[in-house]
């Protein structure tokens, strides 16, 4: 059975894209400006005095607070003579006792502190007396609660999600004829040597 071959497909030729070249606009050149050389005066180096080192530093300070309104009472004093620091501080604790700390610090013994606690000179601050829970002369009354209608119970139903359905595309079928098979012709190669006879 003879089946004719299908007609060859003819395609349109490929069209290359072409772009227009950008327009070249010549702008007048700006006039050349030369900056005049101005001599710059160099700043004179500032004389920096090195911080003086005190081989035997000394200081002394102190303060004191005595506030009768808040009950805050404290003091501190400290002095330094070379590498030895001595000082003390004191404060009134909540129970009315006075705590005093004497301390020293030197290169040989390090930091040492001695704590003294003295009984209070001031009367301890009395704790506040709580007020009675029910004031005197209180009359108990009963008040009816306002009538409130109960709100209706709303039961929310959650709807199932709606899924969109789509039809499948039809299957594209293309009929192709079986290729005709024929033996390829035998190609004979002939070689030529253009320089074969040319010897120098």
UniProtKB/Swiss-Prot annotation:
One GO cellular component term: extracellular space
Name by which UniProt lists this protein: Cuticle protein 19.8
Record-linked InterPro entries: CHIT_BIND_RR_consensus, Insect_cuticle, Insect_Cuticle_Struc_Prot
A Pfam cross-reference name: Chitin_bind_4
Comment text on domains: The tetrapeptide (A-A-P-[AV]) repeats found throughout the protein are also present in many proteins constituting the protective envelope of other species.
Annotated Sequence repeat ranges: 20-23, 26-29, 43-46, 126-129, 144-147, 150-153, 159-162, 177-180
Region (Disordered): 70-89
PANTHER family: CUTICULAR PROTEIN 76BD, ISOFORM C-RELATED (PTHR12236:SF95), STRUCTURAL CONTITUENT OF CUTICLE (PTHR12236)
Transmembrane segments: none
Function: Component of the cuticle of migratory locust which contains more than 100 different structural proteins.
Source species: Locusta migratoria
Keywords (A to Z) from UniProt: Cuticle, Repeat
Domain named Chitin-binding type R&R: residues: 56-127
Gene Ontology MF terms in the entry: structural constituent of cuticle
């Amino acid at each position: 059975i003879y089946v004719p071959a299908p007609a060859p497909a003819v395609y349109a030729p490929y069209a290359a894209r072409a772009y227009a070249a950008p327009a070249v606009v010549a702008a007048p050149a700006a006039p050349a400006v030369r900056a005049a050389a101005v001599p710059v005066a160099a700043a004179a180096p500032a004389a920096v005095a090195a911080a003086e080192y005190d081989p035997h530093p000394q200081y002394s300070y102190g303060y004191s607070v005595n506030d009768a309104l808040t009950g805050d009472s404290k003091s501190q004093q400290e002095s330094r003579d070379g590498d030895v620091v001595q000082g003390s501080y004191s404060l009134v604790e909540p129970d009315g006792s006075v705590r005093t700390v004497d301390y020293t610090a030197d290169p040989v013994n390090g930091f040492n502190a001695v704590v003294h606690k003295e009984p209070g000179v001031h009367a301890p601050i009395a704790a506040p007396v709580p007020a009675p829970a029910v004031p005197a002369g209180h009359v108990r009354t009963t008040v009816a609660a306002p009538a409130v209608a109960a709100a209706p119970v709303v039961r929310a139903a959650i709807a199932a999600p709606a899924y969109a359905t789509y039809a499948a595309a039809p299957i594209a079928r293309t009929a192709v004829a079986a290729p005709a098979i024929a033996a390829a012709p035998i190609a004979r190669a002939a070689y030529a040597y253009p320089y074969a006879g040319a010897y120098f």
